[in-house]
Amino acid sequence: MLYPILEQYDVNREKALAYGFVALADTLCLQKALEGTEFYVKVTIAGRRLEVNVFDSDTDEEYLPFNVPDNISGYVMSVREKVEALLAELKEQCLVKSNVKLQLLDYCSQT
């Protein structure tokens, strides 16, 4: 599932690597267990794309109900809440607010 959070934030690569991300070419990847569940989450950051996938720890198969927005069963919602909490932590630890004004001024000065 794609998250649009990187439209407003930039990744601090050093902080992301310190947090536990692994650098693979131009991509940052994180794999972390979701506490209290039998799942783990893979977070992939490539450019301005942040992708989150949830997998079963025993079978390594993707937990597809997580990706269905209309699925509001209690268990799926609890998994989503844990993922959202992880994303909030990542936002606090690894991301910095984009300064659009400075980016525009920089772009204008280059043209």
Please annotate each region the language model reported.
Residues 1-4, 53-111:
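Intrinsically disordered, low-complexity regulatory regions enriched in serine/threonine/proline
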Residues 9-49, 60, 111:
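Ser/Thr-rich, low-complexity intrinsically disordered terminal regions
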